[in-house]
Amino acid sequence: MDRRDPPGAFDFSRYLGMLQKQGHNFIRLWAWDSTTLDSRANGALGKPFVHHAAPQPWLRTGPGLALDGKPKFDLSKHNPAYFARLRSRVQEAGKRGIYVSVMLFEGWGMMHGGRERGSAPPGWPWRSHPFHKDNNVNGVNGDTDGDDRTGEVHSLAVPAANKVQAAYIRRVVDTVGDLKNVLYEVINEGGRRDWNRWVIETVRERERQRRVRHPIGLTGHGAERLADMLDGAADWVSPGRLDGYGDDPPAWSRERPSLLDTDHIWGVGGSADWVWKAFTRGHNPLFMDPYEGVVLDEPRERWEQVRAAMGHARALADRLDLAAMTPRNGLASTGYCLAEPGVAYVAYLPAGGQVVLNLVGISGTFRAEWVHPLTGARIAGPTVEGGAQRSLTAPFGGPAVVLMSLSRGTAQAALTPQRPSGAPRFAKARGRHEVASLSVRG
C-alpha cells in the first residue's frame, strides 16, 4: 500500500529483519478490503493524499469498468498472486520465529474512516470496495440501505456477499492452515456480532475438515464491546480504549488472552512505560508501528523506545513460566506485578526508586535482578527471605523492572531461558502471553 497505483513493492524481508533485531515475535498481517485508503480520515496521523492497496483476493477481469476506471472484479475468481504472497509472507515470518495474525477482513474503513472524518470525503471506502454494485460483475450489492457510503457487507444482511466471503475464508485456511505460526483475526475494528461469530464458525468448519486448529481473535472498537467479544467463540481478544484499556490498563484475569494493541487505543501511540504496565498487568502488548511513515505518522525517536521496551519485555517473558503467572497488583506497592506467588515476581516501577513486595506467608530465599526497561541491562540485586514485606531500591535512576525468583528447588527451572526451536506456537492457557510487535499496513 502506498500513494502509487499500483503500489510499489514493500521490502517485507527488511521489515522482518527490523523486528527480529528488536526481539519481537508477532505481527498482524493486514488485509485491506477496499482498493484505497484515504488516510486524511486518520487526522494528524494521516497523509494529504490517497493510498492504493493491491493485490486483492479477486481478479479484475471485467467486462466493464469499476468506479476507479479499472476492470470490474469477478468475485468468483480468486487471485492466485494474493494467496501466494500471503503464504510466502507467513512462511518467511515463521522462519524468523514470528507469529502472524492473518487478518481476514478490515472494518475500520467503513465503520469509522468513511464517516466524514478529517478532510476525507465521506464514503470513500465503500466506493472502492469490490462488493459495491458498480465494482463487480457478479451482481453483488452490499449496500442494503442505499446510502452509497457504508456497505453492510460485515453483517449477515447480504447473503450473496456472505457466499463470496465464505469461499474466500476457506481459501485463506487452505493457503496457510498447515503453518504453525498462524493466528486468525476476524476483522479489524468492525463486524456485527452475528457476522463475527459466523466468520469464526466458517474458519472452524474448514479447520475441522483439514484437522488443524489455530487461535481466532476479535478486536475492539468495532461493532462489539469487550463484554460481547468475551461472550463468544473467540480464542483471544483485543480490548480498546472504549473499554477502559488506555494509558493505565487494568489487570487482565480472563481465560482468553488479551492482545492489547495501541491501534485500538491511540492508533499509533503508546510509550515504553505503557509496554511495561501492560505486560505486568497480564496483557500481550502490541504496537502499531508506523515504521518508515509511508502510510501513517512519521519515524520518531519515541517509537524507537517503544520498540526497545517491547523487545526487552519479550526477552524477560522468555525466561518465565508465564502459563503459571497472573497479574497481582496487590503484591507490589507500585500496583504493577506479574507473579506466581512463592516462585517468581515481576514488578514494574514507573517512577523508579523503591518498591515493596508482599512476601507475607511465603517461605524460601529469593534473589532479585533488576532490568532496565529501555536498555535491557540486567543488574544483580540482593537476596531476601520470604515471610514479610520486603523493600527493594532500584540501582539506577528512572523507571525500573525487578524480577524476584526463588533461588532453590525445582522452581528454578521455570526461570531458565527457553530457546525456541522450529515454528513458534501460540499458547492459550490463562496467564500465558507473548510480548509482540504489530505490523504496519503494507
Where are these predicted regions, by residue range?
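Aromatic- and carboxylate-lined catalytic core of secreted/periplasmic carbohydrate-active enzymes
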Residues: 267-383, 391-420
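Mature N-terminal, pre-catalytic/accessory segment of carbohydrate-active enzymes
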Residues: 1-13, 22, 412-442
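Hydrophobic anchor at the start of a short beta-strand
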Residues: 100, 258, 368
